């Protein structure tokens, strides 16, 4: 009798529904798939094995579209865990598809990254996706205040990545990776 692992179960469940949001997020949140994404899309992991990335460098369990603590409130919930919802009284709420932390390999100091993976069905949603990606990165940076840094200790800000996977790109954009950095 064959036993399916969690990746195989998620692939089976998604079968003809892979474009459905929840199924797609569950598939992308698998640590092995995340490890492949990190290996191919980030400089920090390009020389690492996929197994090492999944087992040694991805921290904890990647969070999938879960609610969080309101970032403007002080409470015992304001900890090192990564939530997928970023709320601000003045800026509204952003819900990240998948969000997790990772450690940079082969560094003297333990350097942490905050990584967001977005599954995007519509390649042309009526606004520039790049601007939305920049906005998400900006929110991930600003939300670190009072969690990873306070006052003027900007040296403690963690590097962020927002990686967007377009599930239905136009023919000319299929099998491509576009990178933007600021």
List PLM regions with ranges.
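Accessory alpha/beta interaction modules
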Residues: 1-182
């Amino acid at each position: 009798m064959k036993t399916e692992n969690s990746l195989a179960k998620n692939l089976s469940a998604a079968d003809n529904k892979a474009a459905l949001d929840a199924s797609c997020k569950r598939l992308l949140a698998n640590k092995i798939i995340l490890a492949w994404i990190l290996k191919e899309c980030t400089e920090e992991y390009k020389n690492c094995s996929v197994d090492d990335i999944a087992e040694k460098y991805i921290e904890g369990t990647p969070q999938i579209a879960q609610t969080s603590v309101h970032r403007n409130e002080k409470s015992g919930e304001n900890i090192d865990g990564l939530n997928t919802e970023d709320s601000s009284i003045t800026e509204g709420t952003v819900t990240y598809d998948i969000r997790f932390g990772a450690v940079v390999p082969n560094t003297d100091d333990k350097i942490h990254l905050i990584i967001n993976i977005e599954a995007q069905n519509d390649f042309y949603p009526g606004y520039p996706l790049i601007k939305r990606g920049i906005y998400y990165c900006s929110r991930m940076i600003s939300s670190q205040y009072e969690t990873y840094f306070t006052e003027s200790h900007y040296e403690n800000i963690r590097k962020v990545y927002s990686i967007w996977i377009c599930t239905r790109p136009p023919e000319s954009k299929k099998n491509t990776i576009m990178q933007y950095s600021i």
